[in-house]
């Protein structure tokens, strides 16, 4: 009896549980639809769509790049290795030709400043150290020898004292006799002065040497 009643009760209760489960599923579906209709969900769907489109475009680009790479291979197959080396040499030569200009500028600057420093440090050379320089040869001319006529000695002139005694303190130079004597006397004095001056010059030159 108990078993039969229990089975009846379970059979009677089962349709109600099924109805509740169906209702719960419907409620969940409605909630999901509302979430999909919300702006956040719309943004998410847009992002998913954009990702799909970008992925498809990337596939297209990969195919295009592959085609361009094949075209580049075809173009490079036209040229030989020698042509490639010549092209590379031309580019290298341009780079090398650009570098020496900068090097020349730096060298010029360094040379200019170095030359100034060298000029300041170099001491002026003496005349003896200069190559090819020789001291001037000074030849001492012999002084002319004059015969001693006794012009310097006033006592050798006859009648000189007699004429001066009768005159005043100073003799008269305007007279004809005295003028000739004075000219002879002065000539003798000049010769002696020249001899003395030449002797002084030779002594000075010897001291300098």
Swiss-Prot record:
Positions with biased composition (Polar residues): 167-183
Top-rank taxon: Eukaryota
Keyword hit for Lipid metabolism: no
Pfam families given in the database record: TDRP
One GO term describing the cellular component: cytoplasm
GO BP terms in the entry: spermatogenesis
Keyword terms, alphabetized: Cytoplasm, Nucleus
Subcellular location per the Swiss-Prot or TrEMBL entry: Nucleus; Cytoplasm
Primary localization: nucleus
Region Disordered, annotated ranges: 126-183
Record-linked InterPro entries: TDRP
The keyword Nucleotide-binding is assigned to this record: no
Family: Belongs to the TDRP family.
Protein name: Testis development-related protein
Organism name: Xenopus laevis (African clawed frog)
Gene designation: tdrp
